[in-house]
Amino acid sequence: MFLLYEYDIFWAFLIISSAIPILAFLISGVLAPIRKGPEKLSSYESGIEPMGDAWLQFRIRYYMFALVFVVLDVETVFLYPWAMSFDVLGVPVFIEAFIFVLILIVGSVYAWRKGALEWS
């Protein structure tokens, strides 16, 4: 039989950490004033009136750089706990981490070859 009572703290943390943002959005939606006017429709750029059109389309390159950053950031999240417990885990986990890094290197080379990392 599973001992689910050992996870009571986890479930309490999960419920509380989910309830706080939901309550924040609900309270701000109820308390926020609803006024429609020309100021709501204008864009705000550091306290001054915008010069030209405020609605610009971003180039797809920004999204590609963001995607590569997220992939490398997730790689760091997975590799940091492994690096902290490297001496305890031993060689089999080292081989698994090596394969993980190898897959990420192959993906980075693929993105580089496809031109995802080119700025111009």
From Swiss-Prot:
Origin: domain of life: Eukaryota
Cell location: Plastid, Chloroplast thylakoid membrane
Described function: NDH shuttles electrons from NAD(P)H:plastoquinone, via FMN and iron-sulfur (Fe-S) centers, to quinones in the photosynthetic chain and possibly in a chloroplast respiratory chain. The immediate electron acceptor for the enzyme in this species is believed to be plastoquinone. Couples the redox reaction to proton translocation, and thus conserves the redox energy in a proton gradient.
Enzyme Commission no: 7.1.1.-
Gene Ontology annotations for the cellular component aspect, listed alphabetically: chloroplast thylakoid membrane; NADH dehydrogenase complex
UniProt topology in membrane: Multi-pass membrane protein
Subunit structure: NDH is composed of at least 16 different subunits, 5 of which are encoded in the nucleus.
One GO term of the biological process aspect: photosynthesis, light reaction
Keyword Chloroplast: yes
Residues annotated as transmembrane: 9-29, 64-84, 88-108
Catalytic reaction annotation: a plastoquinone + NADH + (n+1) H(+)(in) = a plastoquinol + NAD(+) + n H(+)(out); a plastoquinone + NADPH + (n+1) H(+)(in) = a plastoquinol + NADP(+) + n H(+)(out)
Molecular function in Gene Ontology: NADH dehydrogenase (ubiquinone) activity; quinone binding
Main location: plastid
InterPro entries the record matches: NAD(P)H_OxRDtase_bac/plastid, NADH_UbQ/plastoQ_OxRdtase_su3, NDAH_ubi_oxred_su3_sf
Coiled-coil portions: none
Recorded family membership: Belongs to the complex I subunit 3 family.
Protein name: NAD(P)H-quinone oxidoreductase subunit 3, chloroplastic
Keywords: Chloroplast, Membrane, NAD, NADP, Plastid, Plastoquinone, Quinone, Thylakoid, Translocase, Transmembrane, Transmembrane helix, Transport
